UniProtKB/Swiss-Prot annotation:
This is Mercuric reductase. FAD binds at residues 181, 201, 206, 216, 472, 480. Pfam families: HMA, Pyr_redox_2, Pyr_redox_dim. It comes from Bacillus cereus. SUPFAM superfamilies: FAD/NAD(P)-binding domain, FAD/NAD-linked reductases, dimerisation (C-terminal) domain, HMA, heavy metal-associated domain. The gene is merA.
Length: 631
């Protein structure tokens, strides 16, 4: 074998690395390492294969190969090892420059220093010890910490070659057709895999069919109806009559159909993978049975999602209750709606029907809404919902549920007192359970956890290394954007031969109530539990000019920072369009920005996002004493 380095232009991301790697593998290359940042591919070829063939393969993949360099065996000493080194004592970009110069003088290459994250990335020749770099940093008056050697192979292609595994019907079978499934299929097709997707029901999964899309369009309708009846401006004589729910639901269903076709169904032919309709179950680790036919694949992805689950309350099974799916198909607004469960689904759908005209009561076992959130967030949304007229029942013990004609009765005990809550409709919104019981997972050696979730490792592999899983059927945050991220990563690992870890350290979440709730990073309590010395800022919404002009001032901004480094650890918001605000905070948390970084960054006036800037100023100032935009 001969080893080569080829310069490659046109790569912009890790996906490009995979495309180049697949192209090289298909023409016979081995030990492939592609790096889009350095713009190069390193690989081995049999002695009888010309490097020009490899360059042609790269060109056929729509990238631009440059000069090729053959490695001689003695050249290993010229190769580089890559390190990540924690560094304390940096406070600004000037510190970054000092460390970069020190490392360069020690022989390091490819140096990247980030004072916000407190780390340095660099490469050293194989024969240079890491202690030389650490000594150079110490001599520059900074404090080096632990050094981690970044094994290029750990995130590059493994020795997996699907071409060597025998004959199968498909390279990749995906069970499910939601966000994780489609993301994975698209990525796998880009890696030249033959892909099939199996779906027993409606294509598109929860989000587009019965979750995000239908609920959010109806929530918007409810907000407009509520504002028409309760607008805060004098001189505007608005009103709203009773809601005709049937045509509103039809409009919602038309939108769902349109988005399902555009974002899911039509993509099947666009990308060229196969859809198989039917129930699937594993026969063994390489085979599933669908509609009586056995189908084989080299790799599988289980992305079957989750469904509503009901609590164990006596009498509930005998009551005609609603789920989040069936509620959105009602053709008439009920006079009264009781909601068991006050998580994000219960709050959103409860407020929706309150805004459409129902008398709504939310019931939950815990003493406060969103008990896993910071108290300030719970207090703000509790105040908002109660101000709007929604009934909140907390600290409830459920005794039984019964139906008396058309009336559903929920018997609870609160602080030792019995109470019966009656309504024409009862919504159960107490959580979701993974969908996997019909898959016959034991036949494939796939284990599940105590909740029925599929057990996966950091690379999205199940307990069978040929079978991966992603999305709501696994542990972790149940958001469609998380599912899509995991689905793409699963394909890169399963088909692309990579070994990339899933990273869910910084995941924003939004509850689409009005005001909405958005959060990212650590709460104050979580930060303390992780050992941080914490500094917090709490800004009431009536200190944000946008809220004042909107005449909607119930809400809060809260920031959590590391008291030592002032890095932003978490951001939590209750405000109009909080979900649109939280992305900026997500970037701050992910990239280790500090309170100072945000303080020195301008925010446009009269936007809700300005609340982040004002919350930053609140760490050190009383913003009520500042003029507009002063900081």
């Amino acid at each position: 074998m001969k080893k080569y380095r080829v310069n490659v232009q046109g790569m912009t991301c890790s996906g490009c690395e995979q495309h180049v790697a697949v192209a090289l593998e298909n023409m016979g290359a081995k030990a492939i390492e592609v790096d889009f940042r350095r713009g190069e591919a390193v690989f081995e070829l049999p002695d009888d294969v010309k490097v020009e063939d490899a360059k042609n393969a790269i060109a056929d993949a729509n990238y631009h190969p440059g000069e090729a360099e053959e490695f001689q065996s003695e050249q290993k000493t010229n190769l580089l090892k890559k390190y990540r080194l924690n560094v304390e004592g940096m406070t600004c970009t000037g510190c970054e420059e000092h460390i970069a110069v020190a490392l360069e003088n020690a022989g390091a290459k490819g140096i990247e220093v980030d004072f916000r994250r407190g780390e340095a990335l660099f490469e050293l020749p194989y024969d240079v010890d890491i202690d030389i770099a650490k000594t150079a940093i110490t001599d520059a008056q900074y404090q080096p910490g632990e050094a981690e050697e970044i094994q290029v192979q750990s995130e590059k292609r493994t020795d997996v070659s699907l071409n060597d595994e025998g004959n199968y019907d498909y390279d990749y079978i995906i069970i499910g057709s939601g966000g994780a499934a489609f993301s994975s299929a698209i990525e796998a097709v880009a890696l030249n895999a033959k892909v099939a997707m199996i779906e027993r029901g409606t294509v598109g999964g929860t989000c587009v069919n019965v979750g995000c899309v239908p609920s959010k369009t109806l929530l918007r309708a409810g907000e407009i109806n509520h504002l028409a009846k309760n607008n805060p401006f004098v001189g505007l004589h608005t009103s709203a009559s009773n809601v005709d729910l049937a045509p509103l639901v039809k409009q919602k269903n038309d939108l769902v159909t349109e988005m399902r076709n555009e974002k899911y169904v039509n993509l099947i032919d666009d990308y060229g993978f196969e859809l198989i309709k039917g129930e699937s179950k594993f026969v063994n680790e390489n085979t599933v049975e669908v509609n009586g036919n056995q189908i084989t694949a080299k790799r599988f992805l289980i992305a079957t999602g989750a469904s509503s689950t009901a609590p164990n309350i006596p009498g509930l099974d005998e009551v005609d209750y609603l789920t989040s799916t069936s509620l959105l198909e009602l053709k008439k607004v009920p006079n009264r709606l009781t909601v068991i469960g006050s998580g994000y689904i219960g709050m959103e759908l409860g407020q929706l029907f309150h805004n459409l005209g129902s008398e709504v009561t939310l019931i939950q076992r815990s003493e406060r809404l969103l008990k896993e959130y910071d108290p300030e967030i719970s207090e703000a949304i509790t105040k908002a919902l109660t101000e709007q007229g929604i009934n909140l029942v907390t600290g409830a013990t459920y005794e039984r549920v019964e139906q008396d004609g058309d009336i559903k009765k929920v018997h609870v005990e609160i602080n030792g007192k019995k109470r019966i809550i009656e309504a024409e409709q009862l919504l159960i919104a107490t959580g979701r359970k993974p969908i996997q019981t019909s898959l016959n997972l034991h036949a494939a050696g796939v284990e599940v956890g105590s909740r029925g979730e599929i057990v996966i490792d950091d690379y999205l592999k199940t307990t069978n290394s040929r079978i991966y899983s992603a999305g709501d059927v696994t542990p972790g945050p149940q958001f469609v954007y998380v599912a899509a991220y995991e689905g793409g990563l699963a394909a890169r690992n399963a088909i692309g031969g990579l070994n990339q870890k899933v990273n869910l350290e910084v995941v924003p979440g939004v509850t689409f109530t009005s005001p909405s709730i958005a959060t990212v990073g650590l709460t104050e309590q979580q930060a303390k539990e992780k050992g941080y010395e914490v500094k917090t800022s709490v800004l009431p919404l009536d200190a944000v000019p946008r809220a004042l002009v909107n005449r909607e001032t119930t809400g809060v901004f809260k920031l959590v920072a590391d008291a030592k480094t002032l890095k932003v650890l978490g951001a939590h918001v209750v405000a109009e369009n909080a979900g649109d605000v939280i992305y900026a905070a997500t970037l701050a948390v992910k990239f280790g920005l500090t309170v100072g970084d945000l303080r020195e960054t301008m925010a446009p006036y009269l936007t809700m996002a300005e609340g982040l800037k004002l919350a930053v100023l609140t760490f050190d100032k009383d913003v009520s004493k500042l003029s507009c935009c002063a900081g």
